[in-house]
Structures are given as structure tokens and as C-alpha cells.
């Protein structure tokens, strides 16, 4: 089984002990959509924050972090989800390939070192003219009633230069083709329909995981984020969070966004909502068993662990990326088992929710294994507990 991914891959600078109630943070919060100010739970570009604040970014990040040094980790929905698959499915016949873009600098070398310790085969276009993309992650573990929240400042760097022309043809000859966080690669993001068409023509299943699209949020704060209608139809499974779903659909709430996706022709989707219920749906024409619009509870097992010992909560960074990875794990497992030909969307929610929950227990998106199979061992008890929870919820809904 072959999985290929293209999209966001960067270095995360993690500031885990921020306080969103600090005067400095509050003074830099956005007051008008797209104005360049910080967005709690969202993303802004460093260059726009500089304009908003009237100060250089180096000074701003020093103030926001109170001068503390950050932890460093690999980030990005495309690469983190793919590494999660390779770690959890290490003993199965699965190969994972990634293509991305970096600068010829220290951060680019660091990215290759991180990935080199995994089973993912990665190739990069390396530019000497632009820095490696980075994201400064401001985490407040006490936000949202102790559930934790993170806000992002992105330095786009080389990521703005990647187009479909640089992506090798062999990457499309795959069983699963994943696009993750392409909004942070603006030129490539504009070619989503072309990328999905190439993958579908090669016979691949297509999975798209979205990310906050600040470029288009700034460009048109009131309009829908662009995503061509044909691209929706070419996306076998769309995975996004509620904020992204609302802005992609131009609606105001999660259910309206879901109904808009259905009308737009998306075959199947999963919409996460932080610590709130997950919403999923699959049409009769999708690769999944027909699934009515259904709410699924988040994983209670992880909530119980954190309630019993709040010190277990590291941060929420990478939860969405690992959720996407868990979804891909589920689909890959089902394809390997070759049951009746149709996929189970609840199983995708199960593995996604368990994987996203596990990410709360370590810093950043990438889990650094000390031995092969370590992440799988940590994940499986969560999967088992969450499966029981979802089965009970399903049985109750049937009554």
C-alpha cells in the first residue's frame, strides 16, 4: 500500500506557556478580520503582524514569549499526518512518500534530520533564495476552560514558491494521495483542482486536510475561501475544523457548513470542533458506506486521563495533524483488509479522534519515538476505549 503526501512541512517554534490574558497578547489581537493581528486559535503571517503592530517581528515574538526560548519540532499537516501513519503502521506493508520545499538553511537541514529518523521517504525542492517555512506557535494550556488553545504566526518563506510543476509524476502513482495544509503554500493551493485531477486519473483515493487560509481571509474577509467546485467533487474525503468549514462554505455554523459541502458535491467529510463533537457525513456515491450527518463525541478516555492528572496535558499543537494521520491510518487498514469494498467512516473518526487525543500528551505534532512501535503502543489503549464509547453512542442513537 502506497501513500503520497504534498503540502505543509515546516519547523515549529513552540512557546507552550503563553497567557492569552497578558496585556501584550491582548494588545496584538485582531480587531477586524484580515487586519494582520493575532487570531486566537488561528493563523497570521509574520509580515502582516509587523504591519499591524508597527514593530519588527523579532521584537514582537520576544515580547509575546517573555524572552523565553522555544522548543523546536517538526510541523505541518501533510508531513505530520504521514509520519503518524508510518509510526503506527510500522509492521504493515505500507510505504509513505512526501514532497515539499525548504530553504538551504539550518531549519531546512533540521527538517531533513527529523524526517530521516522516520520511515517516510521525503524529497525536497531546496531554494537558496528563500528561508525554510516556520511557524511560531503560541500555546496557552489554560485557555478554553483548561482544554488548551494555540495560535500561529507563520513565516511563509520558500513555501510560497512551490507549484505543481515541481511535483514528480511518480508521487501521483499511489493508492492514497494526501494534500495537507496547502493554504500555507499559496501558489500550490491555487492548483488544487489540477493536483486532484492528476491523482484521480492515476487511480488514487484523494484526501484533503485543510488549514487556516489567512491569505484569502485577508484578501476577502467576508467572502468564501476559494476552493473550486470541481475540486470538492474530486476530494474523496475532506477533513477540516469548524472554523475552516465555516469560512470555506461562507456560512455561520457547523451544520450550515456541512449542508453546504453536501450541496457542493463533496463525497464525504469530517469536521472537527476542538473539544466538542465531531460531525461527519458520506454520500451513497462516496467510497464509504452511506453515513447520515452524524455527530460523534470526542474521546472521553483522554478527557478522563487529563481530569485525573492535568499535568499530562502538554499542548494542543499538532492535534489536527495527528487527527488527519489517524484518519489515513484507518482508511489504509481498511483497504489492506479488503472487506466489502466500501469504507467505514465511523472507523476513520475513531482512529482520527484517538490520534488527535494522544497528541495532547506530547509537545508539538511529531512524536519522537525512542523505539519502533512506541507510538502504536501508546495509541492502542486509547483506540480501544474510544471504540467502546462510539459503539455505545451508536447503539443509543439506534434506539
Predicted regions and their residues:
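Glycine-rich phosphate/adenosyl-contacting loop at the front of the ribokinase-like
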Residues: 1-97, 312-313, 393-399
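Conserved phosphate-binding/catalytic region of the ribokinase-like
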Residues: 3-17, 23, 28-34, 198, ...
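Glycine/charged-rich beta-loop-alpha catalytic/anionic-binding loops adjacent to active sites
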Residues: 56-70, 116-119, 294-311
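Active-site nucleophile and cofactor-binding loops and adjacent substrate-binding regions
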Residues: 69-78, 103, 126-130, 317-318
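Conserved phosphate-binding/catalytic loop of the ribokinase/pfkB sugar-kinase fold
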Residues: 123-127, 135-186
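Conserved beta-alpha-beta core of the PfkB/ribokinase-like small-molecule kinase fold
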Residues: 176-260, 266-268, 275-278, 283-285
